[in-house]
Swiss-Prot record:
Pathway: Amino-acid biosynthesis; L-isoleucine biosynthesis; L-isoleucine from 2-oxobutanoate: step 3/4; Amino-acid biosynthesis; L-valine biosynthesis; L-valine from pyruvate: step 3/4. SUPFAM superfamilies: IlvD/EDD N-terminal domain-like, LeuD/IlvD-like. Keywords: 2Fe-2S, Amino-acid biosynthesis, Branched-chain amino acid biosynthesis, Iron, Iron-sulfur, Lyase, Magnesium, Metal-binding. One of its GO terms (cellular component) is cytosol. It comes from Sulfurovum sp. (strain NBC37-1). It is an enzyme of class 4 (lyase). This is Dihydroxy-acid dehydratase. The keyword Magnesium applies. The modification N6-carboxylysine is found at residue 122.
């Protein structure tokens, strides 16, 4: 029996079949599995504007393999376009809408299985979260990464180059013509932005989790190789959907994305220096999978796993196409396996192979791009969780992106919003030796936990990247580099110490010892708490008010929880 029989079998389902016939179904179709094709086509996003054509390829392959496809769409937000204005308030909340929409369509219509087509930003984790709720066999196949851009002299560039170029222009380091050259060359094609930013980090981690096919994270969009990957994914979901019930059970989403899959995802994240946003999203995914996983587990993995692949923004000359040419994610995992427990190789994957079977023949083809385990970029992973009185519940730093010292002590310069911070940086308020504090930008305080790419890019572009640190209860773009610490929990809106800081306070961070603290006495903190009144930003948006009321803090993945 198929799940879809609930809407298509029996005399009492004649009205249901009548409606389905109106969409073009014939008698013979009611004996076939119904496959949801969860697309995220939107013309605004470079990684998504071509996904309508991708869906046609996939649907044709599904029909050719004896199943019935039903395409539906989720929404999408382009973080790059939403950056630097109040549009960014909607980015993280869109993850919840996407998850809800997947759950709604799949469960309302009792579809048997799903193939999901995400690519960028919050769309990937949102679709994964929704798929975990539905818990039917699901294959993920992303649109694919964008090719790197190049300046006229051949220097590789990407979107992060342009954001930092704005800071360089503000500082008088480059001309308007050079900035225009960056603008016109950074994004040369469709696809998810070409570095190891959030989109490509998540698309890569799906390979580690076993829910996508090999090559998902690195094969370029709009290439024949990518088209073949779409077809393979479509064929695979049909094989599963047409199999016996016991076989289908093996490939339910939660049977693939289990605790070991979550641990493998974080291990690969550490090895490849993924975006700090992966912490937020993987914590949320773990909650949907009912996997017990927390920030302390991340540090344990980080201490164990070496960083062996460095990609833009951490290494600006290397992009996803280079990782693909050097052997792809499978070669990274194969190299990690040489040290034993870095990767859990017995876990199942959606292709029916164990992870070991998937990676056993993979090899690094260019050790200048993907290093060996004996010659890592760093002996520890590319992300770390810091603790201290400023982050009692944790804060996240992308250690792979640090350009200066790994320990820093400086004086606080405090801003109650990202806009205030940008104005302060541009006006010269931020000096070498400062710690820029941007607060009331957390999940509740923002609300929506804005990305701080504009202030971090200005800091880098103005030559302060290794001279200042930045801490925030907001988050960062995957394109951020430097001593940037986000996800500070508890956030200012919850009464966290970040909200009590004052200009001139001494702040100390030590990445290697996982410390983030303000040099304040217990008495000073208690006195400030007595006087503290959190800033509550006025909101016209009904959706953002709902979000603020339900969202948890970053240490919980910023998921929504109702009473």
């Amino acid at each position: 029996m198929m799940r879809s029989d609930e809407i298509k079998k029996g005399y009492n389902r004649a009205p249901h079949r009548s409606l389905l016939r109106a969409t073009g179904l014939k008698d013979e179709d009611f004996d076939k599995p119904f496959i949801g094709v969860a697309n995220s086509f939107i013309e605004l996003i470079p990684g998504h504007y071509f996904l309508n054509k991708v869906a046609e390829v996939i649907k044709n392959e599904i029909r050719a393999n004896g199943c019935v496809p039903f395409e539906f769409n989720t929404i999408g937000v382009d973080d790059g376009i939403a950056m630097g204005h109040d549009g960014m308030l909607y980015s993280l909340p869109s993850r919840e809408i996407i998850a809800n929409s997947i759950e709604t369509v799949m469960n309302a219509h009792k579809l048997d299985a799903m193939i999901a087509i995400p690519n960028c930003d919050k769309i990937v984790p949102g679709m994964i979260m929704g798929a975990l709720r539905v818990d039917v066999p699901t294959v993920f196949v992303s649109g694919g990464p964008m090719a790197a851009g190049h300046m006229d002299d051949g220097t590789p560039i990407d979107l992060a180059t342009v954001f930092e170029g704005v800071g360089e222009y503000e500082a008088g380091e480059i001309t308007e013509e050079t900035l225009a050259e960056m603008e016109c060359n950074a994004c040369p094609s469709g696809g998810s932005c070409s570095g190891m930013f959030t989109a490509n980090s998540m698309n890569t981690l799906m390979e580690a989790m076993g829910i996508a096919l090999p090559g998902n994270g690195t094969i370029l969009a709009l290439t024949p190789e990518r088209t073949e990957l779409y077809k393979k994914a479509a064929r695979r979901i049909c094989e599963i959907a047409k199999s016996e019930a016991a076989e289908r059970e093996k490939f339910r989403m939660r049977n693939i994305l289990n605790e070991n899959a979550v641990r493998n995802a974080f291990a690969v994240d550490m090895a490849m220096g993924g975006s700090s946003n992966t912490v937020l999203h993987m914590l949320a995914i773990a909650k949907e999978a009912e996997v017990d996983f927390n920030l302390e587990d991340i540090n344990m993995i980080s201490k164990r796993v070496s960083h062996i692949a460095k990609i833009s923004p951490s290494l600006t000359t290397v992009h996803m196409e280079d990782i693909n040419t050097a052997g792809g994610v499978s070669s990274v995992m194969h190299e990690m396996h040489k040290r034993g427990d870095d990767i859990l190789i017995d876990n199942p994957t959606i292709t029916g192979e164990s992870l070991y079977e998937r990676i056993k023949d993979a090899r690094i083809l260019d050790t200048n791009i993907i290093h060996t385990i004996d010659n890592p970029f760093s002996e520890v992973g590319g992300l770390a969780i810091l603790y201290g009185n400023l982050a009692e519940q944790g804060a996240v730093i992308k250690t792979a992106g640090i350009t200066g010292d790994r320990a820093f002590t400086g004086t606080a310069v405090c801003f109650d919003s990202q806009d205030e911070a940008i104005e302060g940086i541009l006006s010269g308020k931020v000096k070498a030796g400062n710690v820029v504090v941007i607060r009331y930008e957390g999940p509740k305080g923002g609300p929506g936990m804005q990305e701080m790419l504009s202030p971090t890019s200005l800091i880098m572009g103005m030559g302060l990247g290794d001279k200042v640190a930045l801490i925030t209860d907001g988050r960062f773009s995957g394109a951020t580099r430097g001593a940037s610490i986000g996800h500070v929990s508890p956030e200012a809106a919850e009464g966290g110490l970040i909200g009590l800081l004052e200009d001139g306070d001494e702040i100390h961070l030590d990445v290697d010892n996982y410390i983030l603290e303000a040099k304040l006495t217990f008495e000073e903190i208690a006195e400030r708490k007595d006087k503290f009144k959190p800033v509550v930003k006025p909101l016209k948006s009904k959706w953002l008010r709902q979000y603020r009321a339900l969202v948890t803090n970053a240490s919980n993945g910023a998921v929504l929880e109702a009473e």
